[in-house]
């Protein structure tokens, strides 16, 4: 079995080698797109009014899923598609390769378009160089011109699937956060930015064998916190900030409440969506005392403040959680279906549910090939939450950016 694993990638490539028979045309570099800013219509309020009464959980923000992602090269996508038919177990482990055919703009470009929430996949790489030679590329002799040059640096890395889907707008967590912090410094009145971190520890599915992936144990979780503090500094919204003098976060959000939008402008909040790492992250830090990230906990837990509901379902559960004071993250689209009507319905439900953080692979400026896109009606960065506010408690001028 061990020998089979060692040669599985080579066998996979040999079985579908026809995919690389024809060289694709040269690709443009999506990392060099100039930043353009969305323009607010004439006559729309330019000064926040009432944001000192509006709470952070009374906003709704749209953002990108896998915010750093650049689609794999055509020959890699073709190889994966053919491999999925030859090795069904590979397809089961990695999913449909067609769902990788999307490229996001750079993070500053997305911010300029109005996105205020992002999702980053993070791998541990304390010594550097762990991801500089993707197995699939090496096996077929593909020299990827978009392989980031800074992958060899020590530190946390940002990419989708090691050895399979490695292209990224920013290869290190410090690079990604540096871009966001730089934009934030230039726009200090922006709405709070919410960043969802998925800490990845899984390698390739059986029978493939690839780059060994390091786990996020207690010391490595401390490294994550240290990198976040180094990059963002005094711009953080931390669990300590929200808890205040309350005994735990759950009590805080149901009594004192979340910070106001006014107090949150120009700041950045991090949420770790790995429920399996929650206990390790809490160890020695009850109710996240001294920690940087909010956790994916369960309803009613002491550290519960932000919850993950990837599928909006019919929207009713999310609406119930929002009414209790939680901030909820959901997805508008979990891969496009053949029917745009079906995926459009899911997006509409996600927005109507009141989930404060709605992630999509197709945000403003990046529609799918069938025209599907998730955006607010006006070119604004956020809106009053449809569940936790009413016209009497929130009007759009409270959530604009000066």
Whereabouts are the PLM-identified features?
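Bacterial N-terminal signal peptides that target proteins for export
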Residues: 1-11
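A ubiquitous, low-specificity "background" feature that marks scattered single residues
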Residues: 3, 19-21, 127
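Bacterial N-terminal signal peptides
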Residues: 10-19
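C-terminal region of N-terminal signal peptides and the immediate post-cleavage residues
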Residues: 18-34
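Catalytic cores of phosphodiester-bond hydrolases, prominently lipid phosphodiesterases
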Residues: 31-402
